[in-house]
Structures are given as C-alpha cells and as structure tokens.
Design a protein with these regions (language model features):
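Rossmann-fold dehydrogenase core element
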Residues: 101-119
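Beta-loop-alpha module in the N-terminal Rossmann-like domain of NAD(P)-dependent dehydrogenases
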Residues: 46-105
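Short, Asp-centered acidic motifs that coordinate Mg2+ and/or phosphate
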Residues: 29, 61-62, 112
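Short beta->alpha connector loops
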Residues: 8-12, 68-70, 93, 119
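N-terminal Rossmann-like dinucleotide-binding module
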Residues: 1-43
Length: 119
C-alpha cells in the first residue's frame, strides 16, 4: 500500500513511517503547504508537493493526516473527497458538529476515516 502524508510532522516521521515500513508498505508522497522547503531526509525518496497535488495523485492508496488539530476535519474531508481513505491523528474533530460532518462525507465517499492511537 502506498501512503501520502499531509505535512512533515515529527509524529509522522517518528511513529507512522517506521510502522508503515514494518508492515511492508511505503510512504511515496509528502504534501506540504509550501513544498519548496523540502522534507526531513528520514522520508527517503518521496515526492513532495502541495496538499492538493498530493491528494490528486492516483498512485496514493491512503492518506495520513497529522496536521494541526484545526486542520484535521477540512483536510480529511479533502482526502475523502479525493477518494482516499484517511488515518487522522487525534483528536479527529474539535466538535461534535465537525465529527458529524466528517462522518457524513466518509459515508458518501464510502471510504474509511480512522483515528490514530499510539499504543
């Protein structure tokens, strides 16, 4: 499975990336608000682009969203509407209304929205 990651967050580099690799999957794309800054070398050979370009990439099977909390719902909705299942850091939403909106989009898209919880 090929993952796209929204942003170059520390939790993504330290927790998600090793877990994805250990499971035999790969991160192929990192989306950034400003892709010109590049990403941490730990990602290896990944494509770096804007969030929108990353979400439009048909080669990505799923998206991980470790962005700041206020961006969890809007960016997860954008990923779902792009046809990608989403793993989102907690909290998935900042209100019940946001969560209801996200759940409705996930149901319409027939894609999974999953919250990441570290063990």
């Amino acid at each position: 499975m090929k993952f796209g990651v929204l942003g170059d967050a520390k939790i993504a580099r330290e927790k998600l990336l090793p877990a994805i690799r250990a499971a035999g999957h790969e991160v192929t794309h990192v989306g950034r608000r400003d892709p010109s800054g590049g990403v941490d070398p730990v990602w290896g050979d990944v494509r770096v682009s804007t969030y929108e370009e990353m979400l439009a990439d048909p080669g990505i099977d799923a998206v991980y969203n470790p962005l700041p909390n206020h961006l969890h719902v809007p960016m997860s909705i954008a990923a779902l509407e792009a046809g990608k299942p989403v793993i989102c850091e907690k909290p998935v939403a900042l209100s019940v209304e946001e969560l209801d909106r996200l759940a409705a989009v996930a149901a319409r898209a027939e894609k999974m929205e999953q919250m990441a919880i570290a063990a």
